Amino acid sequence: SASAFWKRSKSSLKKKDYNDFFKSISNDNDGSLIHIHTQAEGTLDYSTLFFIPKKAPFDMYNADYKSGIKLYIKRVFITDDDKELMPTYLRFVRGIIDSEDLPLNVSREILQQNRVLSKIKSNSVKKILDEFMKLAKNEDKYSEFYEQYGKPIKEGLYQDFENKDTLIELVRFKTTKSEDKVISFKDYVKNMNDDQKTIYYITGS
C-alpha cells in the first residue's frame, strides 16, 4: 500500500517528504508546486493527498490522457485508471484518494455511481480550488502556475457550474492595456472607464 504515506500525521511530514513521495508516484523529477493533504473523519472517513506538478503533464491536451489519481480503499490499491475521480479540467492533478467507507470488492460501474466517492470528489475539488485561490494572492507564484494550467482552468468555466464563482476569480486574461501581463476579470472591471458599458473579447478555437 505504498506504506500509506498519506495516512501519516501532517505535522510529522516535511516539505522534502512530500516532494520525495510525489516523485515516487509520478516519476516527475521537476517536483510539485503545491501539495494538498486532507484527513477527514466524521460523516465520511477518507484521506486525500494531491500534488500540482511544476510542469504540465506531457499528455495534458491528449484525448487519451492518463489519470493522475490513484484510488485506495482502506489502504488497498484499487485503480489508477479512472478518469471520473477528478473533473477533466483538473486532469493535471496527481495524487491519492483513500476511502475507509467503500467496500473492497467494489466494481468500476458501482464506483461511477457511488455517493460516497461522488462526495469525496466534490469536497476534493473545492479543496483544490481553495488552494488555487490562496496561491493567487501571490502574483509571481500564480503566474508560474497559470502559465502551465491556465487553459484547463478556463475549461472549468464550461464544465463545473457548481464552482463557477471560484473559477471566475481564478481565470486570467490578456487585454489591450495589460501588455504581456494577464489580469483577473475583477481587475478588468475595476479598471474600466466610467463610460464603458461593453466588454469585447476574441475567442480562439
What do these predicted regions represent?
Residues 1-205:
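Conserved GHKL (Bergerat-fold) ATPase module
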